[in-house]
């Protein structure tokens, strides 16, 4: 696979979308966005594609809505054959391009690995995943090996003030009002 983008060294990236099939003969690709507002994917630049274990940088030359989706033209990809090589590759961005948040806000990715503790001090485990259920998100908490309640995993609804009492980014800790037996 030829790499027309620029290689980068930083390995921490955030996947924000995926390329679909080529569109036309001039190097355009269909884009499937994972961002809340689909068009927001184009607010982030540059994009990175993991090609054979190396993050390769690409810049969007142009994009447009097409039918119910979106298509993009990347700099340096001028023919269908070159663009076809990126079909089904995930689109990632550098975390540094994300907007800075206020002290009481956070990105979901920051919650992974945080310790989850009840208001009474019981250590429930660490956040291993977050499920989007539609009504509210749910923390998947991997329990400690010697959990007194025999739990391996807990599903805790992310309901601020009702269940989630405090998220402390600095201490890497989430305080919850939750029964450890659940």
Swiss-Prot record:
Main location: cytoplasm
Name of the gene encoding the protein in the UniProt record: rimM
Function: An accessory protein needed during the final step in the assembly of 30S ribosomal subunit, possibly for assembly of the head region. Essential for efficient processing of 16S rRNA. May be needed both before and after RbfA during the maturation of 16S rRNA. It has affinity for free ribosomal 30S subunits but not for 70S ribosomes.
Domain comment (free text): The PRC barrel domain binds ribosomal protein uS19.
Family note: Belongs to the RimM family.
HAMAP family noted in UniProt: Ribosome_mat_RimM (MF_00014)
Name of the protein in question: Ribosome maturation factor RimM
InterPro entries: PRC-brl_dom, PRC_barrel-like_sf, RimM, RimM_N, RimM_N_sf, Transl_B-barrel_sf
Subunit details: Binds ribosomal protein uS19.
